[in-house]
Amino acid sequence: MEAKIQFIKGLDEKVLPDVRLTRSRDGSTGTATFRFKNPNILDKSTAKEGEITGMYLIDQEGTLETRDVNAQFINGKPEAIESIYIMKSPEAWDRFMRFMERYGESNGLVFTKAS
């Protein structure tokens, strides 16, 4: 099973996100901010599929989800989706990183450490 991201269950998001990670100094918590520029979920053709109910990160281990999803508008038109996934334990961080590794492999993404 390929790792994928969905905003409406059953409808894969094709646009690749910019993902920014932060982690507490002690490693106990972390935040991932996903930004999708012009995602296909905002296309008029996908409007009939249903409403955005959250962001679902799906792989062979299961589903990670967040309800923290916001659209950004420019001149009255939706241009981007920003979603925040919060990890509240070192185990949740490790699980998220496993998902991102699979998602990156499936989509040709690379991890760049901040300098």
From Swiss-Prot:
How it assembles, according to the record, is: Part of the photosystem II complex.
Provide an example Pfam family for this protein. Answer: Psb28
**Gene3D superfamilies, per the entry:** Photosystem II Psb28
Q: Name one GO cellular component term.
A: photosystem II
Question: Which family does the record assign?
Answer: Belongs to the Psb28 family.
The organism's superkingdom is given as: Eukaryota
Whether Chloroplast counts among this entry's keywords is yes
PANTHER family, sorted: PHOTOSYSTEM II REACTION CENTER PSB28 PROTEIN, CHLOROPLASTIC, PTHR34963
Q: What is the lineage of its organism?
A: Eukaryota, Sar, Stramenopiles, Ochrophyta, Bacillariophyta
Task: Give the keywords, sorted.
Answer: Chloroplast, Membrane, Photosynthesis, Photosystem II, Plastid, Thylakoid
User: What InterPro entries has UniProt attached to this entry?
Assistant: Psb28_c1_sf, PSII_Psb28_class-1
Q: Major place of localization? A: plastid
Q: What is this protein called?
A: Photosystem II reaction center Psb28 protein
Task: Tell me the name of the encoding gene.
Answer: psb28
UniProt GO BP: photosynthesis
Q: How does it sit in the membrane?
A: Peripheral membrane protein
| Compartment(s) of residence | Plastid, Chloroplast thylakoid membrane
